[in-house]
Amino acid sequence: MFRRLLNAIRYRARLLPTLPIRRRLGQQVRALDDAGFAFISNNCLAGQLYEMAGRPKSTPTAGLYFTGDSYARFLEDISDGHATSWDRIDPDQMTRHHQQHCAMLRTGEASGVVFLHYPEPEVAARKWNSRFPRLAGREKIVIASLRDGIAESMLDRAKTRYRHFYVAGPAPALPADEFVLDRKCLSGLSAFLDDVLAMGREAARR
């Protein structure tokens, strides 16, 4: 009980200095969500951005992380219109990640999608399958954190297929729960989203 309280106090102490930039990010995400954008990330970061904005998660990439080349393959497939490879996950094809005690979808010998917050494959598949259709008709903003076996060189092809691609690095990038408590990381992402919004305003004036 005491340790839990102490951890909560420490978390709040780290959270307070980032509140202004988190509010700014929430405003940016709401504006981009209203403009028809969707966030994709290789870890929980996209989901946390929607939480900052108080919006439903218009992305399947929440509560999970990709390993190895699985994220690059995912990005390339959906940009090519091959969403059928990913639009529906069968829980019977999933395994359990023994270290994390959660559901996992293997996509290769050393790659896969780890559903960190979902212990049961049925729940993980249901969450993914309900959220994936929300990407339809939306322009994607891609966030790639260089960690969990994801190297920037793996993303070279995917970068050419998306107008808005943000790389969080250098490797190893902070995990999502640390990233959202780091003012420098949040400021860099906010500056990137400012550029996306500015491009949208410029396009609207033409």
What are these regions (language model features)?
Residues 1-34:
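Membrane-proximal basic amphipathic "stem/tether" segments
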Residues 71, 77-123:
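A basic- and aromatic-enriched beta-loop-alpha substructure that forms the phosphate/nucleotide-
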Residues 40-93:
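Adenosine ribonucleotide-centric catalytic and binding domains
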Residues 26-39, 45-46, 54-61, 190, ...:
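Solvent-exposed alpha-helical segments and adjacent loops
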Residues 131-180:
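Extended, basic/helix-rich recognition subdomains
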Residues 172-203:
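C-terminal regions of proteins
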